[in-house]
Protein backbone atom coordinates (compact mmCIF):
# COMPACT_ATOMS: atom_id res chain seq x y z
CA UNK A 1 0.00 0.00 0.00
CA UNK A 2 1.37 3.40 -0.97
CA UNK A 3 0.08 5.31 2.06
CA UNK A 4 -1.24 8.01 -0.28
CA UNK A 5 -4.91 8.94 -0.71
CA UNK A 6 -5.83 8.27 -4.33
CA UNK A 7 -8.95 10.45 -4.51
CA UNK A 8 -7.19 13.68 -3.44
CA UNK A 9 -4.98 15.65 -5.82
CA UNK A 10 -1.87 17.69 -4.91
CA UNK A 11 -4.02 20.71 -4.00
CA UNK A 12 -6.25 18.70 -1.68
CA UNK A 13 -9.22 18.69 -4.05
CA UNK A 14 -11.27 15.53 -4.51
CA UNK A 15 -10.93 13.87 -7.91
CA UNK A 16 -11.94 10.66 -9.63
CA UNK A 17 -9.01 8.31 -10.18
CA UNK A 18 -8.12 7.75 -13.85
CA UNK A 19 -8.21 3.99 -14.44
CA UNK A 20 -8.02 4.23 -18.24
CA UNK A 21 -4.49 2.84 -18.51
CA UNK A 22 -5.13 -0.14 -16.22
CA UNK A 23 -5.58 -3.61 -17.68
CA UNK A 24 -8.97 -5.26 -17.39
CA UNK A 25 -8.96 -8.18 -14.97
CA UNK A 26 -11.58 -10.37 -13.32
CA UNK A 27 -12.25 -8.67 -9.99
CA UNK A 28 -14.35 -9.71 -7.03
CA UNK A 29 -15.05 -8.43 -3.54
CA UNK A 30 -17.06 -9.81 -0.65
CA UNK A 31 -18.39 -7.69 2.21
CA UNK A 32 -20.30 -8.65 5.31
CA UNK A 33 -22.51 -7.06 7.91
CA UNK A 34 -24.97 -8.05 10.61
CA UNK A 35 -28.21 -6.93 12.16
CA UNK A 36 -28.57 -7.79 15.84
CA UNK A 37 -32.13 -8.07 17.11
CA UNK A 38 -34.29 -9.60 19.80
CA UNK A 39 -34.73 -13.37 19.48
CA UNK A 40 -38.48 -12.81 19.04
CA UNK A 41 -37.82 -10.48 16.10
CA UNK A 42 -35.57 -13.04 14.45
CA UNK A 43 -38.24 -15.70 14.92
CA UNK A 44 -40.90 -13.43 13.42
CA UNK A 45 -38.72 -12.81 10.34
CA UNK A 46 -37.84 -16.48 9.90
CA UNK A 47 -41.50 -17.51 10.22
CA UNK A 48 -42.41 -14.99 7.50
CA UNK A 49 -44.78 -13.09 9.79
CA UNK A 50 -43.37 -9.56 9.55
CA UNK A 51 -46.07 -6.98 8.84
CA UNK A 52 -44.16 -5.57 5.83
CA UNK A 53 -43.79 -8.99 4.20
CA UNK A 54 -40.81 -11.12 3.19
CA UNK A 55 -37.95 -9.42 5.02
CA UNK A 56 -35.16 -11.67 3.75
CA UNK A 57 -36.28 -11.69 0.11
CA UNK A 58 -36.88 -7.95 0.04
CA UNK A 59 -33.56 -7.17 1.74
CA UNK A 60 -31.67 -9.42 -0.69
CA UNK A 61 -33.24 -7.64 -3.66
CA UNK A 62 -32.52 -4.21 -2.13
CA UNK A 63 -28.85 -5.14 -1.69
CA UNK A 64 -28.52 -6.28 -5.30
CA UNK A 65 -30.20 -3.12 -6.57
CA UNK A 66 -28.00 -0.94 -4.35
CA UNK A 67 -24.76 -2.47 -5.67
CA UNK A 68 -25.82 -1.44 -9.17
CA UNK A 69 -26.34 2.16 -8.00
CA UNK A 70 -23.13 2.60 -6.00
CA UNK A 71 -21.69 5.29 -8.28
CA UNK A 72 -24.88 7.32 -7.77
CA UNK A 73 -24.42 7.18 -3.99
CA UNK A 74 -20.64 7.43 -3.50
CA UNK A 75 -19.38 10.58 -5.29
CA UNK A 76 -16.04 9.41 -6.71
CA UNK A 77 -16.93 5.80 -7.56
CA UNK A 78 -16.77 4.80 -11.20
CA UNK A 79 -19.97 3.49 -12.80
CA UNK A 80 -19.23 -0.20 -13.28
CA UNK A 81 -20.58 -2.95 -15.51
CA UNK A 82 -21.10 -5.59 -12.82
CA UNK A 83 -21.27 -9.18 -14.03
CA UNK A 84 -22.55 -10.63 -10.75
CA UNK A 85 -24.02 -9.47 -7.47
CA UNK A 86 -25.14 -12.00 -4.89
CA UNK A 87 -26.46 -11.43 -1.38
CA UNK A 88 -26.72 -14.15 1.27
CA UNK A 89 -28.67 -13.62 4.48
CA UNK A 90 -28.26 -16.21 7.22
CA UNK A 91 -29.87 -16.37 10.64
CA UNK A 92 -27.54 -16.56 13.62
CA UNK A 93 -29.32 -17.37 16.85
CA UNK A 94 -26.12 -16.70 18.82
CA UNK A 95 -26.03 -13.08 17.62
CA UNK A 96 -29.12 -13.09 17.72
CA UNK A 97 -29.92 -11.71 14.31
CA UNK A 98 -29.10 -11.96 10.64
CA UNK A 99 -25.67 -12.08 9.02
CA UNK A 100 -25.30 -10.63 5.55
CA UNK A 101 -22.69 -11.44 2.95
CA UNK A 102 -22.56 -9.62 -0.40
CA UNK A 103 -20.44 -10.47 -3.42
CA UNK A 104 -19.76 -8.18 -6.39
CA UNK A 105 -17.88 -9.23 -9.52
CA UNK A 106 -16.82 -7.73 -12.85
CA UNK A 107 -14.21 -7.76 -15.56
CA UNK A 108 -12.79 -4.28 -15.43
CA UNK A 109 -10.13 -1.77 -14.44
CA UNK A 110 -11.14 -0.97 -10.88
CA UNK A 111 -12.17 -2.86 -7.77
CA UNK A 112 -15.69 -3.68 -6.66
CA UNK A 113 -15.36 -3.41 -2.89
CA UNK A 114 -17.56 -0.32 -2.73
CA UNK A 115 -20.30 -2.20 -4.58
CA UNK A 116 -20.02 -5.15 -2.18
CA UNK A 117 -20.06 -2.78 0.82
CA UNK A 118 -23.06 -0.89 -0.56
CA UNK A 119 -24.94 -4.16 -1.12
CA UNK A 120 -24.20 -5.37 2.42
CA UNK A 121 -25.10 -2.00 3.96
CA UNK A 122 -28.40 -1.54 2.13
CA UNK A 123 -29.35 -5.15 2.84
CA UNK A 124 -28.87 -4.46 6.57
CA UNK A 125 -30.75 -1.15 6.33
CA UNK A 126 -33.68 -2.88 4.62
CA UNK A 127 -33.84 -5.55 7.31
CA UNK A 128 -33.92 -2.78 9.90
CA UNK A 129 -36.62 -0.85 8.03
CA UNK A 130 -38.86 -3.88 7.64
CA UNK A 131 -38.62 -4.94 11.29
CA UNK A 132 -38.29 -1.62 13.16
CA UNK A 133 -41.99 -1.59 14.09
CA UNK A 134 -41.43 -4.59 16.37
CA UNK A 135 -37.83 -3.98 17.49
CA UNK A 136 -36.50 -0.44 17.76
CA UNK A 137 -33.33 -1.68 19.47
CA UNK A 138 -31.89 -3.51 16.47
CA UNK A 139 -28.25 -2.79 15.80
CA UNK A 140 -26.49 -2.73 12.44
CA UNK A 141 -22.77 -3.38 12.55
CA UNK A 142 -19.60 -5.11 11.49
CA UNK A 143 -19.84 -3.94 7.89
CA UNK A 144 -16.49 -4.61 6.26
CA UNK A 145 -14.75 -6.06 3.22
CA UNK A 146 -13.67 -9.62 3.94
CA UNK A 147 -12.06 -10.55 0.63
CA UNK A 148 -10.89 -9.01 -2.59
CA UNK A 149 -9.39 -10.60 -5.70
CA UNK A 150 -8.14 -9.62 -9.14
CA UNK A 151 -5.85 -6.79 -8.06
CA UNK A 152 -2.39 -6.23 -9.52
CA UNK A 153 -1.02 -6.47 -5.97
CA UNK A 154 -2.67 -9.85 -5.39
CA UNK A 155 -5.64 -11.30 -3.59
CA UNK A 156 -6.58 -10.36 -0.06
CA UNK A 157 -8.84 -11.80 2.66
CA UNK A 158 -9.36 -11.25 6.37
CA UNK A 159 -7.91 -14.02 8.50
CA UNK A 160 -11.24 -14.89 10.18
CA UNK A 161 -14.25 -13.84 8.07
CA UNK A 162 -16.68 -15.27 10.63
CA UNK A 163 -15.45 -12.96 13.38
CA UNK A 164 -17.52 -9.96 14.39
CA UNK A 165 -15.74 -6.84 15.56
Swiss-Prot record:
A GO molecular-function descriptor: cyclic pyranopterin monophosphate synthase activity
CDD domains found in the cross-reference section: MoaC_PE (cd01420)
Lyase found in the keyword field: yes
Residue positions binding substrate: 76-78, 114-115
Gene3D superfamilies named in the record: Molybdopterin cofactor biosynthesis C (MoaC) domain (3.30.70.640)
Active site: 129
Statement: the UniProt record of this protein carries the keyword Lyase: yes
Top EC class, one word: lyase
EC number: 4.6.1.17
Annotated pathway: Cofactor biosynthesis; molybdopterin biosynthesis
GO biological process: Mo-molybdopterin cofactor biosynthetic process
SS bonds (residue pairs): none
NCBIfam families linked to this entry: moaC, PRK09364.1
Role according to the record: Catalyzes the conversion of (8S)-3',8-cyclo-7,8-dihydroguanosine 5'-triphosphate to cyclic pyranopterin monophosphate (cPMP).
Subunit structure comment from the entry: Homohexamer; trimer of dimers.
The name this protein goes by in its record: Cyclic pyranopterin monophosphate synthase
Amino acid sequence: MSGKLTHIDQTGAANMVDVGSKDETERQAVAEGAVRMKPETLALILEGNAAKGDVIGTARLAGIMAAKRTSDLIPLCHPLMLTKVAVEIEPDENLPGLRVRALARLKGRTGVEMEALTAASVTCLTIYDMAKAVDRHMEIGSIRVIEKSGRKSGDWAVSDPASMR
